[in-house]
Curated annotation (Swiss-Prot):
It catalyses: Hydrolysis of proteins to small peptides in the presence of ATP and magnesium. alpha-casein is the usual test substrate. In the absence of ATP, only oligopeptides shorter than five residues are hydrolyzed (such as succinyl-Leu-Tyr-|-NHMec, and Leu-Tyr-Leu-|-Tyr-Trp, in which cleavage of the -Tyr-|-Leu- and -Tyr-|-Trp bonds also occurs). The keyword Electron transport does not apply. Fourteen ClpP subunits assemble into 2 heptameric rings which stack back to back to give a disk-like structure with a central cavity, resembling the structure of eukaryotic proteasomes. One of its GO terms (molecular function) is ATP-dependent peptidase activity. This is ATP-dependent Clp protease proteolytic subunit. Its EC number is 3.4.21.92. It comes from the Bacteria. It is an enzyme of class 3 (hydrolase). The gene is clpP. Keywords: Cytoplasm, Hydrolase, Protease, Serine protease. NCBIfam families: clpP, PRK00277.1, PRK12553.1.
């Protein structure tokens, strides 16, 4: 994950979102597939974590809270990670709102994606059996005057300490273990992620 924002261009796949047609008392009504799933309180967090995507996820979390503050929200994650600040806006909103947020990893949850996966409601964090989870320390780069480089270096160290502390709280691992395990890219299988405490269970089929 990076503590600096990376601009990403919308994918051409964004224009290929399937539409769903429903029959209502007022006739047919069409939704894009993600809007239809939002009605079921399902949010998708996919791709690079960046400001635009984070704003959309935060808006959906707040909307679903306003719709029903007592009903769970389901956050499906398939992300390689991204900006720390964008990710933390999602994380803070997850902790702020009243509904429980159940997180599900499908495909991959790496870096900030893994952090958000672990930040779901305890007992309601899941991973699909062939998914991969990866934790590591934040990435960053800066160029400029020596004094400014020193300031940014201290900032990324501060962020590293904060993330490690929160990850220790969510996993139940000692802080020194998290610091050791995030020193380099640390990939885990679904079962290993459960054992580490990043998630609570592996979902092999619906109904578990």
């Amino acid at each position: 994950m990076s503590y600096q924002e990376k601009n990403t261009m919308p994918s051409i796949m964004d224009a290929l979102v399937p539409m769903v047609v429903e029959q209502t008392s007022r006739g047919e009504r069409s939704y894009d597939i993600y809007s239809r799933l939002l009605k079921e309180r399902i949010i998708f967090l996919t791709g690079q974590v960046e400001d635009h995507m984070a704003n959309l996820v935060v808006a959906q979390l707040l909307f679903l809270e306003s719709e029903n503050p007592d009903k769970d929200i389901y956050l499906y994650i398939n992300s390689p990670g991204g900006s720390v600040t964008a990710g933390m806006s999602i994380y803070d909103t997850m902790q702020f709102i009243k509904p429980n947020v159940s997180t599900v990893c499908m495909g991959q949850a790496c870096s900030m994606g893994a952090f958000l996966l672990a930040g779901g409601t305890p007992g309601k964090r899941h991973v699909l059996p062939n998914s991969r989870v990866m934790i590591h320390q934040p990435l960053g780069g800066f160029q400029g005057q020596a004094s400014d480089i020193q300031i940014h270096a201290q900032e990324i160290l501060t962020i590293k300490q904060k993330l490690n502390k929160l990850l220790a709280e969510h996993t139940g691992q000692p802080l020194e273990v998290v610091e050791r395990d995030t020193d380099r890219d640390n990939f885990m299988s679904a079962d290993q992620a459960v054992e580490y405490g990043l998630v609570d269970s592996v979902l092999n089929h619906r109904g578990q």
